[in-house]
């Protein structure tokens, strides 16, 4: 293909993604677009075709982004090449969204005709605007009885400030308005910029590990072109590889002769190690390298940390391999080895948020068959010591001696909560209970409010989202971003079982709530830990001070069963003997802590 043909082809390319809040019909719309452009035959079609992970289908959420090439014959008789990049909509996967948007020129904004704009929609729209994307509003689900497209149109104009007079009314489920959406993509989304004859620059926006071909990179080519046999260089570390295959996804991988500026596809170059390929890195040709890298993604910092331990200690290496493979597709997962006296060897992992943590845990158990124990999630605290040092600590067991601590700072988030009017009371009550600091409250329209709070991340980490959903009957939508670190009156609480500290049960708590929390947890553990042959005291302590205690009574055999009547001194002798035995047992006995006990530390305020 000569330069002229390449440029002509580039003019026909449209790269776009679909952004929406959870459940506004994004994956269904993607399915319809695939059907309409006949990318997928009716026979192969199944619901949520792009959500290829079992987990994604079960939970009905999109976790990983997907990129697909479609051909569309427009009304003007020309055939256009569409690249649809599917994105997740959940708070924790904002990073995945920012990666997909960096590879696009336009975005379809899907808003539910019955629900209107939600917090997460807003967050994603701002990401799209930051990337200078052309945004096409689509009002979806207009066939619902509760749909009110005109109200939503007004909302898009008022809240986001987009002109919604030409917003397309559609129903992805019934297939209404799909043709119009495709035509608008042709008209409004700009063709990719970029020079076909410039040195190669391509952005890695995802990577997948294939047991046979090594690491497969998903790339968006910005400048230049790439073919099999080229030697590529990664700009962040200068490593070079020979390209063995290039191609595109039409959900399935299809190999091609070359990829050129504007294309979205994949490259296999027998890259062995996961660590070599950073998402957000720039790929260029070793023979004719680009002078400067593309501006990459910002590094996402994990906000929530938890210990992951294999239940069978000989599975430690399997767990490491599994985490390395997951990290390959999941740029935001971090982990490092750690040991715990109670749980043996494991890893301290960093996640973007709770759903992310859940999904990783489930994938480890499901895809790699490893049984896990997870410890209570914690956040990163900044500890200023008396000798002027600042420590960053994510694991409660690494806290320094209380006498060395000058003060402790914890991360606060700026939380946006959108709720119907009727639920403002319960939401504010919940936020106050979680030590929230009220900032502002805006009325979006007659019946929806946007409330903004500063809340400590550690309070959100536990169960804030579930509590929010249950106190608003599921109507609230919630989005947060990290704002800053602030000093707080925090203490570390340890749990002692049979006078031995269980490091995996330690947690950080605000001093005002320490007493209640200690009481709740001690009672909870009492129910969960099975009775032993000897009495087990459970104590919650702060430093050397015991704040709560409860005892698990011993199981005992009735040693008097065989004394039919008889002398009291005989009975006393048997009882004393039993007592001495229990005492000896207690001195050397150790207590098994079941997995539920670790989780009970999490779901603290449920009673």
UniProtKB/Swiss-Prot annotation:
GO molecular function: GTP binding; GTPase activity; ribosome binding; translation elongation factor activity
GO CC term (a single one): plasma membrane
Binding sites annotated in the UniProt record for GTP: 23-28, 140-143
Domain tr-type G residues, every copy: 11-193
Record field: catalytic activity: GTP + H2O = GDP + phosphate + H(+)
EC numbers, comma separated: 3.6.5.n1
Span of the signal peptide: none
Transmembrane segments: none
Subcellular location: Cell membrane
UniProt membrane topology term: Peripheral membrane protein
SUPFAM superfamilies: EF-G C-terminal domain-like (SSF54980), P-loop containing nucleoside triphosphate hydrolases (SSF52540), Translation proteins (SSF50447)
Any matching Pfam family: LepA_C
GO biological process per UniProt: positive regulation of translation
Main location: membrane
InterPro entries: EF-4 (IPR006297), EFG_II (IPR041095), EFG_III/V (IPR035647), EFG_V-like (IPR000640), EFTu-like_2 (IPR004161), G_TR_CS (IPR031157), LepA_C_sf (IPR038363), LepA_CTD (IPR013842)
Key words of the record: Cell membrane, GTP-binding, Hydrolase, Membrane, Nucleotide-binding, Protein biosynthesis
Enzyme class name: hydrolase
Function, as annotated: Required for accurate and efficient protein synthesis under certain stress conditions. May act as a fidelity factor of the translation reaction, by catalyzing a one-codon backward translocation of tRNAs on improperly translocated ribosomes. Back-translocation proceeds from a post-translocation (POST) complex to a pre-translocation (PRE) complex, thus giving elongation factor G a second chance to translocate the tRNAs correctly. Binds to ribosomes in a GTP-dependent manner.
Family: Belongs to the TRAFAC class translation factor GTPase superfamily. Classic translation factor GTPase family. LepA subfamily.
HAMAP family in alphabetical order: LepA (MF_00071)
Protein name, as recorded: Elongation factor 4
UniProt source species: Lactococcus lactis subsp. lactis (strain IL1403)
Gene (UniProt): lepA
């Amino acid at each position: 293909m000569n330069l002229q043909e390449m440029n002509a082809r580039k003019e026909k390319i449209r790269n776009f993604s679909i952004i929406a809040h959870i459940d506004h019909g994004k994956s269904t719309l993607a399915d319809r677009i695939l059907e309409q452009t006949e990318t997928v035959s009716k026979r192969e079609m199944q619901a949520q075709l792009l959500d290829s992970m079992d987990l994604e289908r079960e939970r009905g959420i999109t976790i990983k982004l997907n990129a697909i090439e479609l051909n569309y014959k427009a009304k003007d008789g020309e055939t256009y090449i569409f690249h649809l990049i599917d994105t997740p909509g959940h708070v924790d996967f904002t990073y995945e969204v920012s990666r997909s948007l960096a590879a696009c020129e336009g975005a379809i904004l899907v808003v539910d005709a019955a629900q209107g704009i939600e917090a997460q929609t807003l967050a994603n729209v701002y990401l799209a605007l930051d990337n200078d994307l052309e945004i096409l509003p689509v009002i979806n689900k207009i066939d619902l009885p509760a749909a009110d497209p005109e109200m939503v149109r007004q909302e898009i104009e008022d809240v986001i400030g987009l002109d919604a007079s030409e917003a397309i009314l559609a129903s992805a489920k019934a297939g209404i308005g799909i043709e119009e959406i495709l035509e608008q993509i042709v008209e409004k989304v700009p063709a990719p910029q970029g020079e076909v004859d410039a040195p190669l620059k391509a952005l890695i926006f995802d990577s997948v590990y294939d047991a046979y071909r090594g690491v497969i990179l998903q790339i968006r080519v910005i400048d230049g072109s790439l073919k099999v046999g080229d030697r590529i260089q990664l700009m962040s570390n200068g490593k070079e590889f020979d390209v063995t295959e290039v191609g595109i996804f039409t959900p399935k991988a299809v190999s091609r002769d070359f990829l050129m500026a504007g294309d979205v596809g994949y490259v296999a170059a027998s890259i062995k190690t996961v660590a070599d390929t950073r998402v957000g890195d720039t790929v260029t040709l070793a023979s004719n390298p680009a002078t400067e890298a593309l501006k990459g993604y910002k590094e996402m910092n994990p906000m929530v940390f938890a210990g992951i331990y294999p239940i069978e200690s000989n599975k430690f290496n399997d767990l490491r391999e599994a985490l390395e493979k997951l990290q390959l597709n999941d740029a935001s997962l971090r982990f490092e080895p750690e040991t715990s006296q109670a749980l043996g060897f494991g890893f301290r992992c960093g996640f973007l948020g709770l759903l992310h943590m859940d999904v990783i845990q489930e994938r480890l158990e499901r895809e790699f068959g490893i049984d896990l124990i997870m410890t209570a999630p914690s956040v990163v605290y900044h500890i200023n010591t008396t000798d002027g040092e600042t420590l960053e600590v994510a694991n409660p067991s690494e806290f320094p001696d209380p006498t060395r601590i000058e003060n402790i700072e914890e991360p606060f988030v700026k939380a946006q909560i959108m709720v119907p009017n009727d639920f403002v009371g319960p939401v504010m009550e919940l936020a106050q209970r979680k030590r929230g600091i009220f900032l502002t409250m805006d009325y979006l329209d007659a019946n929806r409010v946007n409330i903004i709070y500063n809340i400590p991340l550690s309070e959100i980490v536990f169960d804030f989202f579930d509590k929010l959903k249950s106190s608003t009957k599921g109507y609230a939508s919630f989005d947060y971003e990290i704002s800053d670190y602030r000093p707080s009156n925090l203490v570390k609480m340890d749990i002692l079982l049979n006078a031995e500290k269980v490091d995996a049960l330690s947690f950080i708590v605000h001093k005002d709530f320490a007493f209640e929390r200690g009481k709740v947890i001690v009672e909870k553990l009492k129910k969960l830990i099975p009775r032993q042959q000897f009495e087990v005291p459970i104590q919650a302590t702060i430093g050397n001070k015991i704040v709560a205690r409860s005892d698990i009574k011993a199981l005992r055999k009735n040693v008097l069963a065989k004394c039919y009547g008889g002398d009291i001194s005989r009975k006393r002798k048997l009882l004393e003997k039993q007592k001495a035995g229990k005492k000896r047992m207690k001195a050397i006995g150790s207590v098994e802590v079941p997995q539920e006990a670790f989780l009970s530390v999490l779901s603290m305020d449920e009673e």
